[in-house]
Amino acid sequence: MLFGIFFVSIEAKQLDMKTILRNFFSVLRRFKTASVLNVLGLSIAFVAFMLIMMQVNYDYTFDRSHRNADAIFRVDIVHGSKGSQAIICRPFARAFTGSSPLIEEGCLLSAWTESRFFYIEDGGQRTSYKEDAWNVTPGVLEVFRFDMLEGSERSLDEPNSVVLPESMARKIFGDESAVGKQLISANPMEDAKIVKGVYKDFPRNSALKNVMYTSMSPKENYDNWGNWNYFFFVRLGKGMDKAEVLDNFKRNFNAKEAFGNEFEWGEENSLDLRLTSLPDVHFLSNVD
């Protein structure tokens, strides 16, 4: 008895579905133009929805690929109500990094990338290349925790060292190991660069670019307070309070010696500091 009721129910549903489909196609035949417009409208709406969701996901996960992204901060200078700037001078960055044991590592990146012209020699044959490069201090590999496929987080410690993204290493050296290879500058006055490491490419939604990272000269603007041309990032210990780090620096840094006797942190016409977490950098506006 139960099986009979079950099969009758299935047959009824099948008849209902056939009726719905018959009516649907009947409407399509009678109102072709309206039906086509409705289908097109739904298709466009679906595509627009998918594009919006892809953009939302791209922005929401920006810089989230970096390990401990929430512990990485960019140090910004705030000019009262006039806005802020993300470029720092090297001696200021050095003083800030050394101001607290809560800061595990700090690094500088030049405010822009540059194109480098170089060649490699293989069996007496030269092959020339032009690739983008970013001049950085060695700590960048530890602050951002590069996923090193060859080499280590100390790969930029020596002068003239470079690390390459995996895609660039394969482009230049194929399946051979890139470590130890020389990139000879087209400028005869410049020393050759030595590949000391290869890192896994960053995703597109990352503040870091898939370029050659070159080790900054230890002498470059080392004590130059007038050269503000670097992005400055620090990595704090897990669970550390950024407000505590800033307060500690302001209390112990001799700002009057660096900026003048009338300097006071946070005054309307003076300077203040801000630590912007790495995932928030993408969304921050009004920053020079």
Locate predicted features.
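Amphipathic alpha-helical recognition patches that constitute DNA-binding helices
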Residues: 16, 23, 47, 51, ...
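Residue-level signature of the cytosolic catalytic core of signaling kinases
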Residues: 17, 88, 129, 224-226
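Juxtamembrane loop-helix boundary motifs flanking transmembrane segments in multi-pass membrane proteins
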Residues: 16-20, 84, 270
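Structured, solvent-exposed hinge/loop segments at the ends of secondary-structure elements
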Residues: 49-179, 185-192, 246-247, 251-262
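N-terminal Sec/SRP start-transfer signal
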Residues: 2-46
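Membrane-interface anchoring determinants
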Residues: 3, 15, 26-27, 35, ...
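Mid-to-C-terminal secondary-structure elements
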Residues: 1-5, 9, 134-150, 162-288
